[in-house]
């Protein structure tokens, strides 16, 4: 029996499960409820024998996902989330069906994570990719960070994470962050072609291939999660993240200079 979702849309057509983050006014930024619903939707698609491919996207034509909702983060939502296992990312990675990210606009911060944890990324030519963490005092650590290096390489991953620059869809394609880039008007047709091609292949072989790739991810997850737990401490949330959230809401640059104290 289909679940009732609030923040997302879930539909299956012609053996394709389509999961849509449905918060377009917030540029499809997520809250804790959104993350829980996405996790449940991926689990639903994974156990549905009629589903052969999963497509993840955002509502509208402006954003795939702009990361965490800043109001939710300011109220402590991100603090609660980051200290828990990354259930959604693990669920996406371990889904036994091929997962396509249909990137229809901004893919920033946590939205960028979601895209690069999918098996394939098909982007509209106006899409923008990037990370926000150090710019807004919103930390990520462990597997979410180091998995990007497996996708685009160490140097580029460090550039993306540490400098918080923005990258065009063409740059994402050149870097290997996207598999294909097409005009927005052709995005659905292109995603449809990839789905048809995958659905014509042996589902058992695809499951075995996915399990093989997941074995590497589990190794990254084990090492990275230990690092995350040691480095992202509750003390961080007292000031730096709060300053980042306040600055965003007040439309000013955050002032992190006072947090640069010598550590021994």
Give short role names for the model-derived ranges.
Residues 88-94, 102, 108-162, 175, ...:
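CoA-thioester-processing core
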Residues 24, 122-127, 178-226, 234-239, ...:
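C-terminal long alpha-helix characteristic of the crotonase
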């Amino acid at each position: 029996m289909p679940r009732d979702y609030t923040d997302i849309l879930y539909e299956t057509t012609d053996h394709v499960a389509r999961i849509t983050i449905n918060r377009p006014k917030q540029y499809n930024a997520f809250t804790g409820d959104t993350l829980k619903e996405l996790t449940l939707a991926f689990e639903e698609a994974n156990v549905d024998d009629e589903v052969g491919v999963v497509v993840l996207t955002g509502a509208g034509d402006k954003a795939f996902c702009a990361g965490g909702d800043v109001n939710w983060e300011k109220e402590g939502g991100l603090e609660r989330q980051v200290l828990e296992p990354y259930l959604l990312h693990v669920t996406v990675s371990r889904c036994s069906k091929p997962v396509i990210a249909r990137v229809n606009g901004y893919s920033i911060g946590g939205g960028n994570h979601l895209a690069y944890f999918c098996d394939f990324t098909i982007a509209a030519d106006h899409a923008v990719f990037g990370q926000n963490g150090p710019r807004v005092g919103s930390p990520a650590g462990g597997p979410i960070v180091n998995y990007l290096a497996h996708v685009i390489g160490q140097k580029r991953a460090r550039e993306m994470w540490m400098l918080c620059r923005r990258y065009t869809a063409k740059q994402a394609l050149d870097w290997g962050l996207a598999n294909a880039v097409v005009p927005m008007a052709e995005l659905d047709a292109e995603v449809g072609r990839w789905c048809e091609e995958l659905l014509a292949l042996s589902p058992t072989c695809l499951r075995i291939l996915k399990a093989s790739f997941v074995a590497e991810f589990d190794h990254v997850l084990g090492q990275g999660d230990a690092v995350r737990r040691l480095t992202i401490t509750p003390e961080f949330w007292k000031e730096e993240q709060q300053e980042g959230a306040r600055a965003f809401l007040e439309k000013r640059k955050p002032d992190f200079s006072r947090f640069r104290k010598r550590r021994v």
